[in-house]
């Protein structure tokens, strides 16, 4: 991400009126290796391949704000690996996570964690430290530190199925696990900030498992922990939340948790989301990422993009797909989104000019 792109993103996050709606995409290892024709293992384990891949993407699409920017990740492995989850790697896919907390009460026997030294968190920090100055020398910045959320992490450590059952059958044990995951996440974000330095001005939290629970369980098992994470960082930092599962139960509470930007899934029309939280959050979405973004024609992408933009009312929005960029999304469909946005921004300027003419 370029400094001027981050400035635009911050202004959008604060619901400032912008002359043009910006476009941002969440890109990481589910999409980048396949798009560039490289092996996932090379992307993860060869520092030069990782650096050149990210540089190529940013140069190929200079007008798109890539979030979180130079994201060093091993799929979803870093956070659960700190707490002992088993990680399997594949040549042509992201890693798989397997739970190792077979009984919830065994959490009392967990060894103390240390994010700077533990598993894939330590490897991630090393890569950031290795390439930080090189990234800056190319004119880019690293404005965001990133983590999976507390329920997502807990689900990998205990298994999502077991966690869902135990929210009902053993709420006390679940609170203990989610509290531990929250502490890991806060320390993990702070460790990234320490390595990356003073270009960091925001956090990016991804937690789809929040979308698996009802409103009552959200209030008890998710909201207090998400708020703790947001409260652990400066008030003027931008806080982004991603959940491309169902957001109905949590949507109205996310601004109170401390989030400024919401990236949500294809399930809920932007008009409803705008009506419910559009005066309190910037909406980053929500072109259907799979059926349209990957499988659609450029014309279908154009139509879907214009529908999202019209539904947004042209304010308080950052154009994106509904979630992360899906594996297999082709260049022509990304360009179709850009072209539709340019078309919308041009017509918007004409309409605004006519009102003031």
Give a label for each model feature.
Residues 71-113:
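A contiguous, low-structure linker/loop signature
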Residues 1-43, 50-53, 67, 88, ...:
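Active-site loop segments of alpha/beta catalytic cores
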Residues 55-79:
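Membrane helical hairpin/interfacial module
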């Amino acid at each position: 991400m370029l400094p001027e792109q981050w400035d635009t993103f911050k202004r959008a996050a604060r619901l400032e009126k912008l002359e043009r709606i910006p476009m941002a995409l969440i890109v990481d290892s589910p999409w980048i290796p396949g798009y560039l024709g490289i092996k996932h293992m090379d992307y993860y384990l060869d520092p030069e391949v990782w650096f050149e891949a990210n540089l190529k993407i940013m140069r190929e699409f200079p007008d798109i704000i890539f979030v979180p920017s130079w994201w060093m990740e091993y799929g979803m492995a870093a956070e659960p690996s700190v707490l002992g989850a088993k990680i399997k790697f594949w040549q042509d896919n992201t890693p798989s996570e397997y739970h190792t907390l077979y009984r919830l009460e065994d959490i009392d026997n967990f060894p103390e964690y240390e994010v700077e030294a533990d598993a894939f968190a330590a490897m991630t920090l090393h890569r950031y430290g290795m390439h930080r100055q090189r990234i800056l020398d190319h004119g880019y910045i690293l404005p965001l530190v990133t983590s999976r959320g507390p329920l997502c992490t807990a689900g990998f450590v205990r298994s999502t199925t077991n966690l869902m059952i135990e929210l009902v059958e053993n709420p006390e044990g679940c609170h203990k696990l989610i509290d531990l995951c929250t502490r890991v996440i806060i320390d993990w974000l702070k460790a990234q900030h320490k390595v990356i330095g003073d270009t960091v001005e925001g956090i990016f939290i991804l937690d789809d498992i929040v979308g698996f629970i009802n409103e009552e369980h959200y209030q008890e098992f998710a909201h207090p922990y998400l708020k703790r994470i947001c409260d652990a960082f400066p008030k003027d930092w931008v806080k982004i939340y991603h959940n491309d599962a169902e957001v109905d139960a949590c949507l109205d509470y996310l601004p109170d948790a401390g989030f400024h930007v919401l990236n949500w899934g294809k399930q809920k029309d932007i008009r409803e989301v705008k009506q419910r939280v559009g005066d309190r959050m910037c909406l980053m979405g929500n072109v259907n990422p799979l059926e349209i973004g990957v499988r659609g024609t450029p014309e279908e992408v154009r139509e879907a993009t214009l529908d999202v933009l019209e539904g947004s009312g042209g304010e308080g929005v950052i154009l994106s797909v509904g979630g992360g960029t899906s594996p297999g999304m082709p260049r022509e469909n990304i360009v179709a989104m850009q072209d539709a946005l340019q078309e919308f921004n041009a017509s918007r300027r004409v309409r605004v000019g006519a009102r003031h003419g």
